[in-house]
């Protein structure tokens, strides 16, 4: 039975894990790392790079290198968060035909789901190369505070990558699974998850294989990227004060600043001071300029203090919804790379009144939890019951633009809820059901998930027709809504497709594109491998020709030299079949040379063997004595 993998699709880094016996194992990628940068780049030659290779070239290609794409997934172009993001990233964010926020490279538009799919494809390949078999099913994690549109877009990304997404699981819940799988006694835990782009807090009761989420809260636009940008702005401002040049207008310099900021942030978690050195960051008429700034941990903490403080309000709200006080939490589990920052740990300790638990790897624990959930779904992990919740209230718009809740936030999922509504006017023959998600009292202030019409209602005075609206949330947190006229039995239902979102036809096209890209990548990799083999053969043949060329006839020598020249010409192109054919031709042409080399080495061995045999008699006695006279030898 094919394995189901667990993928943590992160804002900054992604990670893949699989169940290995009773334990979840994180799989190393082709570069030997346990996490992969969530970065996709397109080069000028139209090559697609994913992960570390994409990150390495970001400085020289900032406009076509997409990072933190998770912040755009499932968002409309007009979303205030997208407006904010446009000011922070060097790449182009554009409005798609459906009103969603997409990105553009070399004139081609890509949806965030497509870019995410490229990262998922890389994780899929990583798992396939480790397992030695095809992988078609996965459990993918999302921030607990993701709304329906963001969850649906993540599921679409999986589909585009050629994966059947068996379950979308919340990141803090996945972390709790990995942390608490072997815990028998009952505990109430808080999972504080501050990652690269999002923040989540979940309160769970765990024990004896049952993981029950009591409440969840968070901020889908708060994470390490924001900490980096604070530092980038500070460095740019300091440089402007000193040199009078504004680096914020130079995309290349900004990308170098971003990389330096990320590195400095990581260093300051373990040391109290670091130095940022960026030679030749820019130049003016007086010559090149260099940036050199010393940064203390205290200074960095003062720059980001409000960002750390922003995590506390969601913690308060989550505790309130769970009906608990901070003192009733038995353990606080830290998840996400940003929780390595001492200031974050100190803030968590002060709020919850206890030292946070640091026994899990904050970068890997979410992927491990996803793998455990995959094991549960596959039947490999027994006696585990996971009860998650919906993070936001769901309802419809009613008369006067009021938001009428049908399902409150923190309701255990899967769940189903119905309520009867009626018409607002006499003889109304159709109603539009507008579905919203959020906590505000007016519908317009919440997130519109989608809308549909129920038509063919028989004419009647207002308030008479009975229209039953049913909300159904599945275990992925994805919503289905139906409306039924109880009088006629007419029913209309929709799987909520975000008011933008990708249509089935678009997803299908993207799946085909992804497959074609995977095929192109495979061909490119194949060509590189064939070239490597060809170059190795050229090198070894040239060396043999130099050493043993005089052992073959002039005609054979010429044939070998011609075959080498033809193969060299073939390796300058990209035709793998042509390179293979010329490699075979050279291998055949150089067989005579190989024979000559073999015969020469045989002759050498034979000569060496005769000498050894000849000298054996004299040497026999020498093994036992240190000194032997010629006279003694004769008398012996």
Curated annotation (Swiss-Prot):
GO terms for molecular function: ATP binding; ATP-dependent protein folding chaperone; unfolded protein binding. InterPro entries: ATPase_NBD, Chaperone_DnaK, Heat_shock_70_CS, HSP70_C_sf, HSP70_peptide-bd_sf, Hsp_70_fam. Induction: By stress conditions e.g. heat shock. Keywords: ATP-binding, Chaperone, Nucleotide-binding, Phosphoprotein, Stress response. Residues 621-630 have a biased composition (Acidic residues). It holds the Pfam family HSP70. The keyword Phosphoprotein applies. Transmembrane segments: none annotated. Residues 603-636 are annotated as: Disordered. It comes from the Bacteria. The modification Phosphothreonine is found at residue 198. SUPFAM superfamilies: Actin-like ATPase domain, Heat shock protein 70kD (HSP70), C-terminal subdomain, Heat shock protein 70kD (HSP70), peptide-binding domain. PROSITE patterns: HSP70_1 (PS00297), HSP70_2 (PS00329), HSP70_3 (PS01036). NCBIfam families: PRK00290.1 (NF001413), PRK05183.1 (NF003520), prok_dnaK (TIGR02350). PANTHER family: HEAT SHOCK PROTEIN 70KDA. Belongs to the heat shock protein 70 family. Acts as a chaperone. This is Chaperone protein DnaK.
